[in-house]
Protein backbone atom coordinates (compact mmCIF):
# COMPACT_ATOMS: atom_id res chain seq x y z
CA UNK A 1 0.00 0.00 0.00
CA UNK A 2 2.78 2.37 0.85
CA UNK A 3 4.34 1.63 -2.49
CA UNK A 4 1.11 2.43 -4.33
CA UNK A 5 0.72 5.71 -2.50
CA UNK A 6 4.28 6.62 -3.40
CA UNK A 7 3.65 5.84 -7.06
CA UNK A 8 0.49 7.92 -7.09
CA UNK A 9 2.32 10.83 -5.48
CA UNK A 10 5.06 10.66 -8.08
CA UNK A 11 2.52 10.52 -10.90
CA UNK A 12 0.68 13.51 -9.51
CA UNK A 13 3.91 15.46 -9.27
CA UNK A 14 4.57 14.68 -12.93
CA UNK A 15 1.07 15.60 -14.18
CA UNK A 16 0.47 18.89 -12.34
CA UNK A 17 3.13 20.95 -14.19
CA UNK A 18 1.60 19.94 -17.54
CA UNK A 19 -1.79 21.21 -16.48
CA UNK A 20 -0.20 24.46 -15.27
CA UNK A 21 1.70 24.92 -18.53
CA UNK A 22 -1.41 24.29 -20.60
CA UNK A 23 -3.37 26.85 -18.59
CA UNK A 24 -0.60 29.43 -18.95
CA UNK A 25 -0.37 28.76 -22.69
CA UNK A 26 -4.11 29.23 -23.06
CA UNK A 27 -3.91 32.55 -21.23
CA UNK A 28 -1.03 33.68 -23.44
CA UNK A 29 -2.90 32.67 -26.58
CA UNK A 30 -6.03 34.48 -25.44
CA UNK A 31 -4.00 37.59 -24.59
CA UNK A 32 -2.28 37.44 -27.96
CA UNK A 33 -5.63 37.09 -29.70
CA UNK A 34 -6.96 40.13 -27.83
CA UNK A 35 -3.80 42.07 -28.74
CA UNK A 36 -4.03 41.06 -32.40
CA UNK A 37 -7.68 42.09 -32.51
CA UNK A 38 -6.94 45.40 -30.79
CA UNK A 39 -4.00 46.04 -33.16
CA UNK A 40 -6.17 45.26 -36.20
CA UNK A 41 -8.84 47.63 -34.91
CA UNK A 42 -6.23 50.32 -34.32
CA UNK A 43 -4.91 49.88 -37.86
CA UNK A 44 -8.44 50.23 -39.19
CA UNK A 45 -9.00 53.42 -37.18
CA UNK A 46 -5.65 54.84 -38.36
CA UNK A 47 -6.58 54.18 -41.99
CA UNK A 48 -9.92 55.93 -41.53
CA UNK A 49 -8.18 58.83 -39.80
CA UNK A 50 -5.70 59.11 -42.67
CA UNK A 51 -8.60 59.26 -45.13
CA UNK A 52 -10.12 62.16 -43.22
CA UNK A 53 -6.75 63.92 -43.03
CA UNK A 54 -6.29 63.56 -46.78
CA UNK A 55 -9.82 64.82 -47.40
CA UNK A 56 -9.31 67.84 -45.14
CA UNK A 57 -5.96 68.60 -46.80
CA UNK A 58 -7.54 68.36 -50.26
CA UNK A 59 -10.38 70.63 -49.15
CA UNK A 60 -7.91 73.15 -47.71
CA UNK A 61 -5.93 73.10 -50.96
CA UNK A 62 -9.09 73.53 -53.02
CA UNK A 63 -10.30 76.34 -50.74
CA UNK A 64 -6.93 78.06 -51.03
CA UNK A 65 -7.02 77.82 -54.83
CA UNK A 66 -10.57 79.18 -54.93
CA UNK A 67 -9.52 82.02 -52.61
CA UNK A 68 -6.70 82.94 -54.99
CA UNK A 69 -9.08 82.83 -57.96
CA UNK A 70 -11.50 85.06 -56.07
CA UNK A 71 -8.72 87.56 -55.34
CA UNK A 72 -7.78 87.68 -59.02
CA UNK A 73 -11.41 88.12 -60.07
CA UNK A 74 -11.86 90.92 -57.53
CA UNK A 75 -8.69 92.58 -58.81
CA UNK A 76 -9.89 92.42 -62.41
CA UNK A 77 -13.27 93.86 -61.43
CA UNK A 78 -11.63 96.52 -59.28
CA UNK A 79 -13.53 95.50 -56.16
CA UNK A 80 -10.58 95.88 -53.82
CA UNK A 81 -7.35 97.82 -53.36
CA UNK A 82 -4.29 95.99 -54.67
CA UNK A 83 -0.86 96.59 -53.18
CA UNK A 84 2.40 95.07 -54.28
CA UNK A 85 5.45 95.39 -56.48
CA UNK A 86 4.62 97.53 -59.47
CA UNK A 87 5.31 100.53 -61.63
CA UNK A 88 4.30 104.18 -61.89
CA UNK A 89 4.29 105.84 -65.31
CA UNK A 90 3.85 109.62 -65.42
CA UNK A 91 3.03 111.40 -68.70
CA UNK A 92 2.90 115.12 -69.38
CA UNK A 93 2.60 117.28 -72.47
CA UNK A 94 5.67 118.62 -74.25
CA UNK A 95 5.85 122.01 -72.55
CA UNK A 96 8.48 123.25 -75.00
CA UNK A 97 6.33 122.75 -78.08
CA UNK A 98 4.68 125.77 -79.67
CA UNK A 99 3.10 126.59 -82.99
CA UNK A 100 6.31 128.28 -84.12
CA UNK A 101 8.61 125.46 -82.99
CA UNK A 102 6.89 122.46 -84.55
CA UNK A 103 7.70 121.19 -88.02
CA UNK A 104 5.75 122.82 -90.84
CA UNK A 105 2.58 120.90 -91.51
CA UNK A 106 2.75 119.19 -88.14
CA UNK A 107 -0.10 119.50 -85.65
CA UNK A 108 0.68 121.05 -82.28
CA UNK A 109 -1.79 118.64 -80.69
CA UNK A 110 0.62 115.80 -81.48
CA UNK A 111 2.80 117.14 -78.68
CA UNK A 112 0.04 116.65 -76.13
CA UNK A 113 -0.94 113.46 -74.32
CA UNK A 114 -4.18 112.02 -75.73
CA UNK A 115 -6.50 109.16 -74.81
CA UNK A 116 -4.90 106.95 -77.47
CA UNK A 117 -1.57 107.30 -75.65
CA UNK A 118 -3.17 106.28 -72.37
CA UNK A 119 -4.93 103.33 -74.02
CA UNK A 120 -1.72 102.12 -75.67
CA UNK A 121 0.23 102.19 -72.41
CA UNK A 122 -2.59 100.57 -70.43
CA UNK A 123 -2.71 97.76 -73.01
CA UNK A 124 1.05 97.29 -72.77
CA UNK A 125 0.77 97.02 -69.00
CA UNK A 126 -2.03 94.46 -69.33
CA UNK A 127 0.03 92.44 -71.80
CA UNK A 128 2.92 92.57 -69.32
CA UNK A 129 0.71 90.85 -66.74
CA UNK A 130 -0.53 93.73 -64.60
CA UNK A 131 -3.42 92.64 -62.37
CA UNK A 132 -4.50 96.15 -61.35
CA UNK A 133 -4.13 99.49 -63.19
CA UNK A 134 -5.30 103.03 -62.52
CA UNK A 135 -5.03 106.43 -64.22
CA UNK A 136 -5.01 109.36 -61.79
CA UNK A 137 -6.52 106.96 -59.22
CA UNK A 138 -9.34 105.95 -61.58
CA UNK A 139 -9.29 102.14 -61.54
CA UNK A 140 -9.23 100.46 -64.94
CA UNK A 141 -11.90 97.73 -65.11
CA UNK A 142 -13.40 95.79 -68.06
CA UNK A 143 -16.08 98.48 -68.60
CA UNK A 144 -13.73 101.48 -68.30
CA UNK A 145 -13.91 104.11 -71.03
CA UNK A 146 -11.03 106.46 -71.82
CA UNK A 147 -12.03 109.26 -74.16
CA UNK A 148 -11.15 112.79 -75.09
CA UNK A 149 -13.32 115.75 -76.07
CA UNK A 150 -11.25 118.75 -77.04
CA UNK A 151 -8.68 119.22 -74.30
CA UNK A 152 -10.72 117.29 -71.74
CA UNK A 153 -9.86 113.66 -71.03
CA UNK A 154 -12.24 111.42 -69.12
CA UNK A 155 -11.61 108.07 -67.46
CA UNK A 156 -14.67 106.24 -66.13
CA UNK A 157 -16.59 109.41 -66.94
CA UNK A 158 -14.40 111.46 -64.59
CA UNK A 159 -12.28 114.36 -65.83
CA UNK A 160 -8.54 113.75 -65.48
CA UNK A 161 -5.71 116.04 -66.51
CA UNK A 162 -1.96 116.20 -66.90
CA UNK A 163 0.21 114.94 -65.53
CA UNK A 164 -1.35 111.53 -66.07
CA UNK A 165 -0.16 109.09 -63.40
CA UNK A 166 -0.61 105.45 -64.38
CA UNK A 167 -0.10 102.89 -61.63
CA UNK A 168 0.15 99.15 -62.19
CA UNK A 169 0.70 96.21 -59.84
CA UNK A 170 1.93 92.78 -60.85
CA UNK A 171 3.51 91.65 -64.07
CA UNK A 172 6.93 92.22 -65.56
CA UNK A 173 7.56 95.63 -67.08
CA UNK A 174 11.16 95.26 -68.26
CA UNK A 175 10.25 95.86 -71.92
CA UNK A 176 8.05 98.90 -71.36
CA UNK A 177 10.84 101.34 -72.27
CA UNK A 178 12.34 99.20 -75.02
CA UNK A 179 13.89 101.02 -77.99
CA UNK A 180 11.26 101.52 -80.68
CA UNK A 181 8.44 100.89 -78.23
CA UNK A 182 5.48 103.22 -77.77
CA UNK A 183 6.94 105.14 -74.83
CA UNK A 184 10.26 105.52 -76.62
CA UNK A 185 8.41 106.82 -79.71
CA UNK A 186 6.46 109.42 -77.70
CA UNK A 187 9.66 110.66 -76.11
CA UNK A 188 11.83 110.73 -79.20
CA UNK A 189 9.36 111.99 -81.80
CA UNK A 190 7.14 114.32 -79.78
CA UNK A 191 9.10 115.12 -76.64
CA UNK A 192 6.34 113.86 -74.36
CA UNK A 193 7.60 114.02 -70.79
CA UNK A 194 7.49 110.45 -69.47
CA UNK A 195 8.98 108.97 -66.32
CA UNK A 196 8.85 105.29 -65.43
CA UNK A 197 9.57 104.18 -61.88
CA UNK A 198 9.50 100.64 -60.54
CA UNK A 199 8.57 100.41 -56.88
CA UNK A 200 8.29 97.59 -54.36
CA UNK A 201 5.11 98.97 -52.82
CA UNK A 202 2.48 100.40 -55.18
CA UNK A 203 -1.20 100.68 -54.27
CA UNK A 204 -3.91 100.73 -56.92
CA UNK A 205 -7.14 101.83 -55.29
CA UNK A 206 -10.43 100.04 -55.88
CA UNK A 207 -13.04 101.25 -58.37
CA UNK A 208 -15.19 103.91 -56.72
CA UNK A 209 -18.11 103.84 -59.15
CA UNK A 210 -21.02 101.49 -59.76
CA UNK A 211 -20.22 98.44 -61.88
CA UNK A 212 -22.88 97.72 -64.50
CA UNK A 213 -22.95 94.03 -65.41
CA UNK A 214 -25.83 94.45 -67.86
CA UNK A 215 -23.63 93.91 -70.90
CA UNK A 216 -21.05 91.69 -69.24
CA UNK A 217 -20.34 88.40 -71.00
CA UNK A 218 -18.37 85.36 -69.93
CA UNK A 219 -14.98 85.29 -71.63
CA UNK A 220 -14.67 82.53 -74.23
Task: Give the ranges of each region predicted by the language model.
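Core subunits and conserved enzymes of cellular information-processing
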Residues: 1-220
